[in-house]
Amino acid sequence: RSIGSDFVTSTLMSYVVRANYNYASKYYLTATARYDGSSKFAEGKRWGLFPSFSAAWNIAEENFMKEQDVLSQLKLRLGYGLVGNQNIDDFAFYTLYDAKLEDGKVTYVPKGRRGTKDITWESQRQFNVGVDMGFLNGRITASLDAFLIKNKDLLMTRSLPLTSGFSSAVENIGAIENKGIEFSMNAKLIETR
């Protein structure tokens, strides 16, 4: 016979600071920082700092662009950011046990997952370079972006040999890199007033 009760809760606490700067609607700077703490990680591994920065140059507002009538918008963008992931079960850093009652005695057996005290935040670094363009007073717009995304310390469940007494453990294993180019275009073909 099994004895059991469950009460599972986790907490995420965040501190966020952001600064924006705009000079003459031509030059833009943004800096953001998040300091996140999650109860899903063991003491000493709970907090992660995740900054991001971006800059843009609105070339269409420059004096040398005033005389032309082809481009109604031209903006160059550059961005970098670090994002954290804590998408794991609560208490993955603990080895959890079930209580069993047999012949009047209570015994404890592992639930199957081995706790991992040193798991920490999975992190994703994002780099982006882009350009926004507008033609015919904004009736046609286009954006071109090149990006590079690198994930490291992936939070994954690893199978363990049954001889260990456990079936799995959550660990920071692996890395993924994703890169590409995106293009989008919009048009207002018919405009009524």
Language-model segments: which ranges?
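Extracellular/periplasmic, surface-exposed regions of secreted and cell-surface proteins
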Residues: 1-193
